[in-house]
A protein has these predicted regions:
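Interfacial loop-to-helix junctions that mark the boundaries of transmembrane helices
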Residues: 1, 12-19, 55-68, 194-207, ...
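Hydrophobic alpha-helical transmembrane segments
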Residues: 2-3, 7, 22-25, 70, ...
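Flexible hinge motifs at transmembrane-helix junctions and intramembrane kinks/re-entrant loops
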Residues: 8-26, 36, 61, 213, ...
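Transmembrane alpha-helix interface/packing and boundary motifs in multi-pass membrane proteins
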Residues: 10-18, 114-124, 164-175, 265-267
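Membrane-embedded alpha-helical segments and adjacent helix-loop junctions characteristic
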Residues: 22-148
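Transmembrane helix-loop junctions at the membrane interface of multipass transporters and ion channels
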Residues: 50, 54-55, 59-63, 183-200, ...
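Juxtamembrane and boundary regions of transmembrane helices in multi-pass small-molecule transporters
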Residues: 125-129, 144-257
Length: 267
């Protein structure tokens, strides 16, 4: 039964006939009903496994909701949604593009720095890239008539590869940079490996992370060289878009304060 439920879960996550979270809840619920989730308790005297009770099955099914790591991921995801809905993520991205976007290489570093700044607060590289970085990149490429099926080498390929590569680096630098990080940490702790906290994780990866972060846009520039070398128009566009945002709104200020407080408490 367990193998059937597990196989059904995998197929459901691949085909996605409904949201993945809902598929996971169905799998856990079915496991609870058939009492195949928790490991049976073996009687030391007889060596015979005891029957799993309803209480044990329910306790196993709900155990994840009391897991501190799960709540950490949930809180960070909420902060990530706040960045997108408040517009703070877009403001940060436009500011950096306006300052560094006068050349194609500088624009690549602007995208990389934006992702690095957002990484501690948005534990999903997909949400970070799709919710904040990609909308900016997709607005820049048409300015140079660069599309996936038309002139991609002008600048579009370079910018998208930088966004893809740097988000992998930033996801590794911070414990809250990607959802799998704290989960992997918990699995390590259960295996007897001393678990790191936010600060020790950051310091441990920092020497390698700095090198990777610095060379990634540069290597992408070398191996996926854009035909457009200078891009003052992009910096001007970003500056105009940034001005249209006006002063920081109440929601953006509140979001920034929450982010700083959360980061301080995580450290």
């Amino acid at each position: 039964i367990y193998v059937s439920i597990f196989a059904g879960l995998v197929v459901g996550l691949i085909l996605e006939p409904m949201p993945p979270a809902f598929i996971g809840i169905i799998a856990v619920t079915v496991s609870m009903l058939f009492k195949v989730g928790p490991a049976p308790i073996v009687d030391k005297a007889t060596g015979v496994a005891k029957a799993i009770t309803d209480a044990q099955a329910i306790s196993w099914g709900l155990s994840g909701f009391s897991n501190a790591i799960v709540w950490l991921i949930f809180a960070a995801f909420m902060i990530g949604i706040g960045y997108e809905n408040s517009g703070l993520g877009r403001r940060i991205a436009l500011f950096l593009v306006a300052k560094l976007g006068k050349s194609s290489l500088g624009l690549g570093y602007a995208i990389a720095i934006t992702d690095l700044v957002l990484a501690p607060f948005i534990p999903s590289n997909a949400a970070r890239s799709g919710g904040t970085i990609y909308p900016i990149v997709s607005s820049i490429c048409p300015m140079f008539d660069s599309y996936p099926d038309k002139n991609p080498r002008k600048i579009g390929s370079y910018l998208n590869w930088v966004a893809l590569a740097t988000t992998c680096v930033s996801s590794s630098i911070f414990l809250t940079g990607a959802a799998p990080n704290p989960l992997a940490l918990e699995l390590s702790a259960k295996s007897g490996i001393v678990a790191a906290n936010w600060g020790t994780w950051f310091l441990a990866f920092l020497p390698v992370g700095i090198i990777l972060f610095i060379i990634t846009p540069l290597l992408t520039y070398v191996f996926c060289k854009p035909e457009v070398k200078g891009s003052p128009e992009i910096a001007a566009w970003a500056k105009d878009e940034y001005k249209k945002l006006g002063s920081m709104t109440r929601s953006e200020i509140f979001m920034a304060l929450i982010s700083v407080l959360a980061l301080v408490l995580w450290i």
